Amino acid sequence: MMPLRILVWNADGVSTKLPEVECFVRRHEIDVLLLSETHCKGAETPKLFGFVAYTANDPSGGNAKGGAAILIKNSLAHFPLTPIATAKVQLAPAVIETALGPISFGAVYCPPRFAWTTDEFKDILEEFQTKFIVAGDWNASHWLWGAGRSNQRGIALANLVLNSEVDSLATGGPTRYPYGCRGSPGYIDFALTKGVLGIHANISAVVELSSDHLPLVITLDAGAISYPKMERLITRRTNLEVFQSQLESTLPLNTAINSGQDVDDAIELLTNNIKSAARLATRSISRQPAADRIPIPREILLLIAEKRRLRTRWMRSRHPSDKTEWNRALSRLRCALVLHKAAWFDERLANTGVESEATHSLWKATRAIKRRCTRKAPLVDSNGTWCRTDLGQAEVFAAHLAERFQPFKLASLQQVEETQDQLNQALQMDMPITPFEPCEVAEVIVRQSNNKAPGHDVICNATLKALPRQAILYITLVFNAIVRLQYFPYQWKLGIISMIHKPGKPEREPASYRPISLLPSISKVFERLIAVRIVSIMEAQGITPEHQFGFRAGHCTVEQLHRVVEQILTAYDSKEYCNSLFLDIREAFDRVWHIGLQLKIKQTLPAPYFGLLKSYLEGRRFAVRFHSAISTEHNVAAGVPQGSVLGPLLYCLYSHDMPQPDVSLYGKSMLATFADDVCVTYRSRCEHDAADGIQDFAYRFSEWARRWNIGINSSKSNNVCFTLKRRTPPPVYIEEVPVPQPNAAKYLGVLLDRRLTFSKHVTDIRTRLRAKVAKHYWLLSSRSKLSLSNKLTIYKQILAPNWKYGCQIWGLACDSHIKRIQAIQNKVARLITGCEWFVRNTTLHRDLKLATVFDEINKHSSRYHDRLERHRNRLASALNRSRPPRRLNRRQPRDLITRSPLTRVRRS
């Protein structure tokens, strides 16, 4: 096991010295960096490739000063402790898992202007565990660590070392050489340790890096534990012929599957044989160094050696001329490092593209921008206790999700008993489910994406695509047994959940993380096969309502937005109020009541599907994976399975009988749903009638939701009245709570304001688009060596979709708003070409073959309306045939097909 190597260094400002620090770390194979005097302000952290940083910055503000930081390799298992950031001391601690147990490490900086006592040093060290190494700039001198003269702080710290189990680890020589010639060398950089006496620890000073302090390297014979990497069964080193032949010889096709236990045994046999065959067919090789590391050429190594030689000479002579020579060598080295990194980066960009022949992938470069750094932060559990270890945080997440996967208790006891009684009634006999054919199974497997992560069985879609014909036949045999026995395998009911932090939410709260569930890939293949049969039954019987556009083939959000906007425009032309209610369903997919869902399945689908889906829902479990730890398993008492294929379909079935607006009472109403997004509109010339219509629907929807244990979040719902009049209808109440009445509401990603000007939506687009341009500036700027075609591809495929979404609807905005988007496109075109100010925007668009925003709106609108002509949903196809009255000079969505700047709209 490799020893752990720690760098201890007072950087005297680290931001400008990161290139040489990176070079030093690679040459000396450093695993942990303990930096002091980082000069970082606020939440600023030093960024080093392959390392994660935890800081304790000086809180006094003003000029950058002080500060400590610990940087740990991403691959090492660790967790941070609470930092100490006061004017008197800055301490950044973390715990690293090693072969000899957890060891605490801390980077410390003690400013020289404060007096210390032994008890104060003891207090800050008591925060650590039984084994720790705290190193940095203590500004304390004493003979214990080699100093000839002791100061007050050194005496206080030495008393702690002499009268406790704490030991000092120092080089015995000077570690600080002042820049001036008059100051004497100092002995103020060292480490305090505890519990590592039995471990061989060696410390040495290195004449490198550029500050008045020498870097210290601690070698600790306690190998660190790395995070386990996700196992990949099929790689480039896998011999597929060996893999397939091994599987064909181990999978028996004459297996008799007559019970649920037989199904579980068959799944276990299939999983184990696939794993063993893949491991047998994959040759193991030693891990190669990362290809994206910047190589260190011989010229830079010579400059480092020269700088080291000149610094050693100055440390001995302390002559100003030797100091000048050292500074010049340091400047040459820094310049060479910057130029070499820039040249390497330009060469890499020049060989980057979307073609298969390109050396580097353009999509990987842009994906790295989207990927957020996974910084570890401690969590607070329900008792207010801090949890820092991986296992502890995994258990906190699991406990939080276990509470979340519980049904609401909104239905009355009588309603619950009635539902249970109906569920217990005998089933009618029905035809069995049509068996699967091997060609069906093979077709579904081929269509699976290779980019999907596997479940707990680590069998990915690429592995399934490499299966031989005999394995496909065996899988078909198992699938048909599952359908025949109406038994869903036990192994497929376990989901591994990873938690993703929501931007802008507090890191210490479990509710600030979004769960992502990973299920076995083979189970998803089965779900896709059975989903095809369920969808055909639901469409034949008309179970899915026409107003539900979510999770349906051939449906999208733009069509539902079109329906809502058409109601608003019709109200404007008819001098009416269009009162709208946008409902927010609380944790819609996680709180589905299983008993109620099973009853609706029983009432709508044939009996064999009920038995199969009942087994599918019962006994489901989950565990949370957090870095290197996996929590204990918990039961799922509510909700549709996350990450599954059948989950969205089951939610649509669960909500298919929601109440409709009462058209006969108030008229001119519309209900639009997309998955769990519900919008209802009422049009009336009287604001009170419009409010009464919405209130009547809200009351009936609340009754229905309470009956089926569906929670409504009144505070997050919105009641917006779209009108050109000045009056506002009375507020709407849900469960005696008034619904907020803002001037705009976001529905399916588009901000709809009261007068439908789309000004707020255009402002939101510009904000997001400018932020994306800033993130991709290093790829798009004229100084980038990326080819012009690749820059244009980045804009078209990554940036432009931010404003193209919904342009068939928000394109109704006036020309001045559209030109605000066009202005950003003009700037991007000028950025990627580097053209001067006198080059016309029309010339840039013509030479780049880049369509204007107006042309793109026309093109997308034309395609959209052509699709509406052939749409299978009656409500969507009616959008093309309707001809509402036109009293105002406002555009309709169909007018965008031929729209151009400054065109007027004629009244019909």
From Swiss-Prot:
EC number: 2.7.7.49
Cofactor or coenzyme needed: Mg(2+); Mn(2+)
PROSITE patterns: RT_POL (PS50878)
An annotated Gene Ontology molecular function: RNA-directed DNA polymerase activity
Coiled-coil intervals, chain numbering: none
Sequence segments annotated as region (Disordered): 883-908
Pfam assignment, any one: RVT_1
Residue intervals of the Reverse transcriptase domain: 481-752
Catalytic reactions of this protein: DNA(n) + a 2'-deoxyribonucleoside 5'-triphosphate = DNA(n+1) + diphosphate
SUPFAM superfamilies reported for this sequence: DNA/RNA polymerases, DNase I-like
CDD domains the UniProt entry points to: RT_nLTR_like (cd01650)
Transmembrane segments: none
Top-level taxon of the source organism: Eukaryota
GO biological process, one term: DNA transposition
Further facts: At least 30 copies of X-element are present in the genome and some elements are polymorphic between different strains.
PANTHER family: ENDO/EXONUCLEASE/PHOSPHATASE DOMAIN-CONTAINING PROTEIN, ENDONUCLEASE_EXONUCLEASE_PHOSPHATASE DOMAIN-CONTAINING PROTEIN
Protein known as: Probable RNA-directed DNA polymerase from transposon X-element
Organism: Drosophila melanogaster (Fruit fly)
Organism phylogeny: Eukaryota, Metazoa, Ecdysozoa, Arthropoda, Hexapoda
